[in-house]
């Protein structure tokens, strides 16, 4: 099995490389409602310099309005963004107490636990926890 360090050191010879995912664009039709949800409901850390950015660890959720860029609003559906948490059942209970509704029950894949829900704009998110420790 390859380690993370093997993957980090791999580089195609003589080519520019993609270094990492810099942010996830969170489409919204109501930026203030989204900021409140990601900050107050999910507990993401707001950026002190950019009101449209919320942080989960090293990942930035960039709240944006596609319609202001001449694009149609389309919620992220069918491939929920996984949010790692220490205990899916406990976090689900916390979010349900704040009014978040989940799609079905929490499920066990044999590798991890997952519970799927959506933000107020319909963008699908997932609470996630793998059994194996992260390297």
Positions of the model-derived regions?
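N-terminal beta-strand motif that seeds the catalytic metal site of vicinal oxygen chelate
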Residues: 2-33, 79-81, 131-135
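Core segments of cupin and vicinal oxygen chelate
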Residues: 16-19, 25-62
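Vicinal oxygen chelate
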Residues: 20-29, 70-98, 113-118, 123
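Short Pro/Gly-enriched beta-strand edge/turn motifs at strand-loop
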Residues: 34, 98-100
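Conserved short beta-strand elements that form part of the metal-binding/catalytic scaffold
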Residues: 44-78, 124-130
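Short, small/polar residue-rich loop motifs at catalytic or cofactor-binding pockets
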Residues: 48, 110-112
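Residue-level "edge-of-site" marker
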Residues: 51-52, 108, 135
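Conserved S-adenosyl-L-methionine
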Residues: 103-107
């Amino acid at each position: 099995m390859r380690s993370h360090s093997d993957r980090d050191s791999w580089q195609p010879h003589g080519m520019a490389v993609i270094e990492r995912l810099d942010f996830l664009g969170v489409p919204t039709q109501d930026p203030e409602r989204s900021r409140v949800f990601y900050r107050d409901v999910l507990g993401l850390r707001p950026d002190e310099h950019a009101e449209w950015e919320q942080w989960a660890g090293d990942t930035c959720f960039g709240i944006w309005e596609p319609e202001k860029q001449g694009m149609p609003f389309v919620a992220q559906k069918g491939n929920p963004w996984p949010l790692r948490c220490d205990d899916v059942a406990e976090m689900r209970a916390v979010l349900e107490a704040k009014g978040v509704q989940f799609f079905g029950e929490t499920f066990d894949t044999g590798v991890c636990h997952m519970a799927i829900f959506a933000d107020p704009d319909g963008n699908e998110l997932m609470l996630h926890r793998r059994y194996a420790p992260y390297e």
